Amino acid sequence: FLGERLPVIRKFLTAESHETQNDALKELIAIQTQDFVNVLEPMDSKPVTIRLLDAPLHEFLEDSHEQNPMLGLRGVRLALVTENLYRAQTRALISAAQKRLEASGNPVIEIMVPLVSIKGELETTLRWIREEIMEAPNDIRLGTMIETPRAALIAEELAPLVDFMSFGTNDLTQMTYGFSRDDVEASVIKQYIKMDILQESPFAQLDASGVGKLVQEAINSSRAVNPKIKIGICGEHGGDPTSIRFLVNSGVNYVSCSPPRIPIARLVSAQESLK
């Protein structure tokens, strides 16, 4: 949604009439349809997980003055107060899937809802998505992010609603510690490491005794009510060997990381799985 796409999302967010909002959504659907086609084509027959819009409001609206934008109107919250946003993204994804099928492709799609903290947020959003995918050309799996401490604590309420869940460990670490990553990385964490208060940055290596405990308890409670649920993590921890070892032993099915870290993530995951 940045670059050339930024004016479209701004038009939607600042629309003062349904007509203007609908015009913006039509533009959004057209743009995202092609974006999704470009993603699905090289990943043909492989699962592609699309996380619905999650960025904080200030990344789109420079005049937005939220006191704490990372905890403000973003993710599922933005979708719930502007209902048609996630519907539009879902329509674009279905359109892209149809185009791939017409080109003899085999799109395998998963849709993930971000920043859930309340069961009702997920229930409402999934209902909207299911209404949009009723005529989808193939099956679409639905999932949720677990990136707030409350979501981890009520994972057994969320797990029956979805096919998969993914821990967003960057945000989960921020909210568990009460750290603003952008603010404390240099000013606090480096000093804490020098003072031996911290051994490693919790944003570089997963905090097993705190954040990790939330992850482990959420996995256990989720599998108790939905044994077949697929569980993974996304974030910088997905490329850290120590974090990967902990996560594999905690029961995750996969880790997601930035491209340069994929080789080490694969190696460590395989080694740990064979033990």
Locations of regions flagged by a protein language model:
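Conserved alpha/beta-domain cores
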Residues: 1-275
